[in-house]
């Protein structure tokens, strides 16, 4: 679910590395939820979830700056998609997490993983050739 696939590569090393990191962070939460059922992972999950929020915001800002710098025509629609995930992550707060109901966390992380992979394959791939033609690899 959270593994990197070569099919996700947009052929821009810095962006690919950031995408890999997003999958890695989400995977850490998933792994925590599925290990050691007798141990309360709430604080760790919250800490990693915060890191996921922060890194997602960092990645989106970086990607959007590149789009603006190189004059990518679909920047505005791309930003709207980014905003959707940011709002979803911000909406998911401490009160929404019940470690006794792991399914709520799994649901969020599955959504994030599916959203990221879908976004990369459908939306980010649109800028792959554009960036490469502008010398960005």
Regions found by a protein language model. Give the residues of each.
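Small-residue-biased structural context
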Residues: 1-137
């Amino acid at each position: 679910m959270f593994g990197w696939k070569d099919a996700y590569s947009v052929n821009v090393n810095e962006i690919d590395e950031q995408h890999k990191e997003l999958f890695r962070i989400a995977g850490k939460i998933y792994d925590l939820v599925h290990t050691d059922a007798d141990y309360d992972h709430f604080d760790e999950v919250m800490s990693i979830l915060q890191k996921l929020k922060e890194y997602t915001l960092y990645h989106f800002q970086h990607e959007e700056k590149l789009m603006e710098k190189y004059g990518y025509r679909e920047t505005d629609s791309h930003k709207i998609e980014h905003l959707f995930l940011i709002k979803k992550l911000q909406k998911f707060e401490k009160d929404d997490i019940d470690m006794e109901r792991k399914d709520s966390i799994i649901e969020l992380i599955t959504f994030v993983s599916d959203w990221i992979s879908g976004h990369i394959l459908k939306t980010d791939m649109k800028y792959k050739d554009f960036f490469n033609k502008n010398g960005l690899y």
